[in-house]
A protein has these predicted regions:
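Conserved short strand/loop->alpha-helix "switch" segment adjacent to the catalytic nucleotide/phosphoryl-transfer site
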Residues: 24, 28-34, 114-143, 161-164
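ATP phosphate-binding glycine-rich loop and adjacent ATP-lid/helix-beta elements
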Residues: 174-203
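Short C-terminal beta-strand
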Residues: 201-211
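Conserved DHp (HisKA) dimerization/phosphotransfer helix of two-component histidine kinases, i.e.
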Residues: 41-122
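Single conserved hydrophobic/aromatic residue that forms the stacking wall/gate
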Residues: 2-10, 14
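Conserved HAMP-HisKA connector
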Residues: 15-55
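Conserved DxG motif in ATP/Mg2+-binding regions
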Residues: 164-173
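Conserved ATP-binding N-box helix of the HATPase_c
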Residues: 46, 53, 128-156, 182
Protein backbone atom coordinates (compact mmCIF):
# COMPACT_ATOMS: atom_id res chain seq x y z
CA UNK A 1 0.00 0.00 0.00
CA UNK A 2 2.79 2.42 0.92
CA UNK A 3 4.41 1.70 -2.43
CA UNK A 4 1.17 2.62 -4.22
CA UNK A 5 0.91 5.84 -2.19
CA UNK A 6 4.49 6.83 -3.07
CA UNK A 7 3.81 6.06 -6.72
CA UNK A 8 0.63 8.14 -6.66
CA UNK A 9 2.41 11.04 -4.95
CA UNK A 10 5.23 10.92 -7.48
CA UNK A 11 2.67 10.88 -10.27
CA UNK A 12 0.94 13.94 -8.81
CA UNK A 13 4.25 15.81 -8.54
CA UNK A 14 5.13 14.93 -12.15
CA UNK A 15 1.67 16.03 -13.29
CA UNK A 16 1.98 19.39 -11.50
CA UNK A 17 5.46 19.93 -12.93
CA UNK A 18 4.22 19.09 -16.43
CA UNK A 19 1.27 21.47 -16.10
CA UNK A 20 3.55 24.24 -14.82
CA UNK A 21 5.97 23.66 -17.71
CA UNK A 22 3.11 23.69 -20.22
CA UNK A 23 1.78 26.98 -18.80
CA UNK A 24 5.26 28.48 -19.01
CA UNK A 25 5.63 27.42 -22.64
CA UNK A 26 2.19 28.75 -23.54
CA UNK A 27 3.01 32.07 -21.89
CA UNK A 28 6.30 32.25 -23.81
CA UNK A 29 4.54 31.53 -27.13
CA UNK A 30 1.87 34.14 -26.35
CA UNK A 31 4.55 36.71 -25.51
CA UNK A 32 6.47 35.88 -28.68
CA UNK A 33 3.33 36.22 -30.80
CA UNK A 34 2.63 39.62 -29.22
CA UNK A 35 6.15 40.72 -30.11
CA UNK A 36 5.79 39.57 -33.73
CA UNK A 37 2.39 41.29 -33.98
CA UNK A 38 3.87 44.55 -32.67
CA UNK A 39 6.76 44.30 -35.15
CA UNK A 40 4.33 43.69 -38.02
CA UNK A 41 2.37 46.80 -37.03
CA UNK A 42 5.59 48.83 -36.72
CA UNK A 43 6.74 47.95 -40.25
CA UNK A 44 3.30 47.95 -41.90
CA UNK A 45 4.10 50.94 -44.24
CA UNK A 46 7.21 49.16 -45.52
CA UNK A 47 5.33 45.87 -45.92
CA UNK A 48 2.80 47.74 -48.10
CA UNK A 49 5.66 49.27 -50.10
CA UNK A 50 7.20 45.84 -50.62
CA UNK A 51 3.87 44.37 -51.71
CA UNK A 52 3.40 47.18 -54.26
CA UNK A 53 6.90 46.70 -55.66
CA UNK A 54 6.37 42.95 -56.00
CA UNK A 55 3.08 43.62 -57.83
CA UNK A 56 4.96 45.90 -60.24
CA UNK A 57 7.47 43.12 -60.87
CA UNK A 58 4.69 40.60 -61.42
CA UNK A 59 2.90 42.94 -63.84
CA UNK A 60 6.11 43.97 -65.64
CA UNK A 61 5.45 47.57 -64.63
CA UNK A 62 8.51 49.84 -64.77
CA UNK A 63 12.19 48.92 -64.91
CA UNK A 64 12.50 45.42 -63.45
CA UNK A 65 16.06 45.96 -62.18
CA UNK A 66 14.99 49.16 -60.40
CA UNK A 67 12.00 47.35 -58.90
CA UNK A 68 14.17 44.51 -57.62
CA UNK A 69 16.71 46.96 -56.17
CA UNK A 70 13.90 48.92 -54.50
CA UNK A 71 12.53 45.71 -53.00
CA UNK A 72 15.99 44.96 -51.61
CA UNK A 73 16.19 48.38 -49.93
CA UNK A 74 12.79 47.93 -48.28
CA UNK A 75 13.62 44.35 -47.29
CA UNK A 76 16.90 45.37 -45.62
CA UNK A 77 15.11 48.05 -43.61
CA UNK A 78 12.45 45.53 -42.52
CA UNK A 79 15.11 43.00 -41.52
CA UNK A 80 17.26 45.47 -39.59
CA UNK A 81 14.45 47.28 -37.74
CA UNK A 82 12.89 43.92 -36.82
CA UNK A 83 16.21 42.73 -35.37
CA UNK A 84 16.51 45.94 -33.34
CA UNK A 85 12.96 45.55 -32.01
CA UNK A 86 13.66 41.95 -30.99
CA UNK A 87 16.90 42.92 -29.21
CA UNK A 88 15.15 45.81 -27.47
CA UNK A 89 12.71 43.35 -25.92
CA UNK A 90 15.43 42.04 -23.61
CA UNK A 91 17.95 44.92 -23.50
CA UNK A 92 17.57 48.58 -22.60
CA UNK A 93 20.95 49.48 -24.11
CA UNK A 94 22.41 48.33 -27.43
CA UNK A 95 25.95 48.51 -28.73
CA UNK A 96 26.34 51.55 -31.01
CA UNK A 97 27.65 49.18 -33.68
CA UNK A 98 24.10 47.81 -34.09
CA UNK A 99 22.90 51.18 -35.42
CA UNK A 100 26.10 51.68 -37.41
CA UNK A 101 25.84 48.29 -39.13
CA UNK A 102 22.13 48.79 -39.84
CA UNK A 103 22.75 52.12 -41.58
CA UNK A 104 25.77 50.76 -43.45
CA UNK A 105 23.85 47.83 -44.94
CA UNK A 106 20.95 50.09 -45.88
CA UNK A 107 23.35 52.53 -47.58
CA UNK A 108 24.88 49.69 -49.59
CA UNK A 109 21.51 48.67 -51.01
CA UNK A 110 20.53 52.29 -51.69
CA UNK A 111 23.65 52.46 -53.90
CA UNK A 112 22.49 49.32 -55.73
CA UNK A 113 19.16 51.09 -56.31
CA UNK A 114 21.04 53.76 -58.26
CA UNK A 115 21.46 56.56 -55.73
CA UNK A 116 25.04 57.56 -54.98
CA UNK A 117 25.03 56.84 -51.24
CA UNK A 118 27.94 57.29 -48.83
CA UNK A 119 28.14 56.44 -45.15
CA UNK A 120 30.74 57.65 -42.66
CA UNK A 121 30.79 56.75 -39.00
CA UNK A 122 32.74 57.01 -35.78
CA UNK A 123 30.96 55.24 -32.95
CA UNK A 124 31.71 53.78 -29.54
CA UNK A 125 29.82 52.75 -26.43
CA UNK A 126 26.12 52.04 -26.16
CA UNK A 127 22.86 53.72 -27.18
CA UNK A 128 19.50 53.23 -25.54
CA UNK A 129 17.51 50.63 -27.49
CA UNK A 130 14.57 53.03 -27.79
CA UNK A 131 16.74 55.74 -29.35
CA UNK A 132 18.47 53.26 -31.66
CA UNK A 133 15.07 52.24 -33.02
CA UNK A 134 13.85 55.85 -33.27
CA UNK A 135 16.94 56.91 -35.24
CA UNK A 136 16.82 53.98 -37.66
CA UNK A 137 13.09 54.50 -38.15
CA UNK A 138 13.83 58.19 -38.87
CA UNK A 139 16.33 57.16 -41.55
CA UNK A 140 13.98 54.55 -43.01
CA UNK A 141 11.05 56.94 -43.39
CA UNK A 142 13.32 59.72 -44.67
CA UNK A 143 14.57 57.37 -47.40
CA UNK A 144 10.99 56.35 -48.15
CA UNK A 145 10.22 60.01 -48.93
CA UNK A 146 13.28 60.82 -51.06
CA UNK A 147 14.15 57.57 -52.89
CA UNK A 148 12.57 58.66 -56.15
CA UNK A 149 13.66 62.30 -56.09
CA UNK A 150 17.38 62.31 -55.31
CA UNK A 151 20.59 61.20 -57.00
CA UNK A 152 22.97 61.50 -54.05
CA UNK A 153 22.75 60.84 -50.34
CA UNK A 154 25.27 60.98 -47.51
CA UNK A 155 24.97 59.75 -43.93
CA UNK A 156 27.39 60.65 -41.15
CA UNK A 157 26.93 59.01 -37.75
CA UNK A 158 28.95 59.91 -34.68
CA UNK A 159 28.41 58.44 -31.21
CA UNK A 160 30.74 59.88 -28.60
CA UNK A 161 30.79 61.48 -25.14
CA UNK A 162 27.20 60.37 -24.42
CA UNK A 163 25.87 62.09 -27.56
CA UNK A 164 24.58 60.88 -30.92
CA UNK A 165 25.05 63.10 -33.96
CA UNK A 166 23.46 62.08 -37.25
CA UNK A 167 23.93 64.23 -40.34
CA UNK A 168 22.21 63.61 -43.67
CA UNK A 169 23.03 65.43 -46.92
CA UNK A 170 20.59 64.89 -49.75
CA UNK A 171 20.59 66.30 -53.28
CA UNK A 172 17.10 67.62 -53.86
CA UNK A 173 15.55 70.04 -56.34
CA UNK A 174 12.85 70.83 -53.81
CA UNK A 175 13.01 71.54 -50.11
CA UNK A 176 11.55 68.60 -48.22
CA UNK A 177 9.53 68.95 -45.04
CA UNK A 178 10.23 66.33 -42.38
CA UNK A 179 6.88 64.78 -41.32
CA UNK A 180 5.74 66.02 -37.90
CA UNK A 181 5.15 62.54 -36.50
CA UNK A 182 8.72 61.62 -37.43
CA UNK A 183 10.03 64.70 -35.63
CA UNK A 184 7.92 63.78 -32.61
CA UNK A 185 9.62 60.37 -32.37
CA UNK A 186 12.95 62.15 -31.90
CA UNK A 187 11.89 65.13 -29.78
CA UNK A 188 9.93 63.05 -27.26
CA UNK A 189 13.20 61.23 -26.53
CA UNK A 190 14.98 64.52 -25.84
CA UNK A 191 16.46 64.86 -29.31
CA UNK A 192 16.61 67.78 -31.70
CA UNK A 193 16.18 67.88 -35.49
CA UNK A 194 17.18 70.85 -37.63
CA UNK A 195 17.12 71.20 -41.42
CA UNK A 196 18.72 73.57 -43.90
CA UNK A 197 18.22 73.84 -47.64
CA UNK A 198 20.90 75.42 -49.79
CA UNK A 199 22.04 75.08 -53.41
CA UNK A 200 19.75 72.13 -54.19
CA UNK A 201 20.95 70.24 -51.12
CA UNK A 202 18.94 69.34 -48.06
CA UNK A 203 20.91 69.13 -44.80
CA UNK A 204 19.39 67.29 -41.84
CA UNK A 205 20.97 67.34 -38.38
CA UNK A 206 19.82 65.08 -35.54
CA UNK A 207 21.31 65.30 -32.05
CA UNK A 208 20.39 63.48 -28.87
CA UNK A 209 21.95 61.97 -25.78
CA UNK A 210 22.79 58.30 -26.14
CA UNK A 211 21.57 57.15 -22.72
CA UNK A 212 18.07 56.13 -21.78
CA UNK A 213 17.59 58.06 -18.55
CA UNK A 214 18.18 61.65 -19.66
CA UNK A 215 14.53 62.44 -20.42
Amino acid sequence: RSTLMRSSAASDVYKRQSEAELKKRRAAVTEQNKLYDSITEFIRPQLCDLENILKNIENNSGDISVNYAGACVVNVYIKRISNLLIMAKSRKMLNAFELENSIRELAEYISVYGISCSFFSNVSGEISAEKTIALFKFIGIFIRHIMNCTDALLFNLKVHDRFIDLKINCDSKNEMKIPDDLLDDITKLGGNVTTEYDADTLFVFVRMQSGGDDI
